Amino acid sequence: MLSAVARQMPREAPSPFQIVTGMSAGAIVAAAVACHAARFREGVVALERVWRNFHSEQVFRADAASMLRAGLRWTLALLSAGRLTAPPESVFDSSPLGHLLERHYDFKRMRQAMADGHLESLAIAASNYRTARSVAFYESRDPEPAAADGWQRGVGTQLSVTHLLASSAVPFLFPAVRLDGEYYGDGAMRQIAPLSPAIRLGADRLFVVGVRDQPKSPDMVATDRVPAPSVGQVIGFMLDTLFIDSLHAGVAQLERINRLIEQSAVPSPEGLRRIEPLVIVPQADFSAIAARHARAMPRSVRALLRTMGASNVGGSELLSYLLFESSYTRELIAIGREDAMARRDEIAHFLGTSVRTSAATTRVRRAATIESAPLPATSLALAR
């Protein structure tokens, strides 16, 4: 999706997004955009290179020895009722992902982009297991953004790879991450206001990228031969329910508020303003795509999924949370690019970009914009 946007930008142009937010897998993408805010296209190319060459071993330990140790520990904890050993914190060890992010993410570069005026804020959402509430960790050029005043779920901090690991820690599958004495998990869990961080940080326009479409009504015929759901299918269903998509509801609420503001004859209350959204959601069934690439997964993971009954189409939901192989990610990149190119003119109009705009012209316009009356702050919001 972002690669199509980057293709519309001059090669050396800075990011068109002054405020970047992300949750779950979107947090990893958002941080990459923020770290390369000074040279947007270069950053997207680097990000795509990583995703196009992904393998499970770069995200979690999938070798037979690691899987066997985890299995034995689970078994021993179960048989001893936890007296001999505590069960593992999760099914998989996600430490390889931390190493990968440490190699590719330079938050000092992000802070330099803020100092140079290319970026206002980055916010990463994660879910607090103790309070069952979503928290937005943010870092801004302005230490105390005016719009964030009274924001109870916003925590100003110095962002790091640890925040990305917390936001992308899928429950049960990957371990919770400790931040400031609290444990956090995937930022998409019970997320009821995915657009709030960007709005709180001052955005007037929202470019929203999601990966989950609105629920579809499958054309299914009732039959007495429907098999009982497997453990893997149930877990996949539970995760899918836990990550229930609130993106469309948030956009619908935003559009209702916009209409009320436009129709109101009196000035809006302080802090209430019209916000223009553009939402891009790939029109694809990611579970079905994941099922086609299941054999690309490590043999040990495939064996685990088979024991859980998640190796067939019914278990494709769970499979989609664990599939990090290049054949799968390359197909997703291609789908996202096609969807974005189909709306190329709409995106270019929204961002105010032109394919023929020179890098020099872009820099002059940006400088003039910052030094005089600024255009509305454009935010990039990325969701799982």
Predicted regions, residues:
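Acidic, Ser/Thr-rich peripheral helices and adjacent loops at domain boundaries
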Residues: 220-259, 300-303
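C-terminal helical/tail subdomains of lipid-metabolizing enzymes
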Residues: 88, 101, 263-384
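Glycine-rich, charged/polar anion/phosphate-binding loops
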Residues: 108-109, 190-195, 257-267
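Active-site periphery "cap/insert" segments of enzyme catalytic domains
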Residues: 88-126, 135
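Active-site gating loop/helix substructures
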Residues: 115-209, 214-239, 314-323
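Short helix-terminating capping/connector loops at secondary-structure junctions
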Residues: 11-16, 113-120, 269-274
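Patatin-like phospholipase
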Residues: 1-91, 95, 99-101, 140-153, ...
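Extended hydrophobic secondary-structure segments that form protein cores and membrane-embedded regions
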Residues: 18-24, 121-126, 277-281
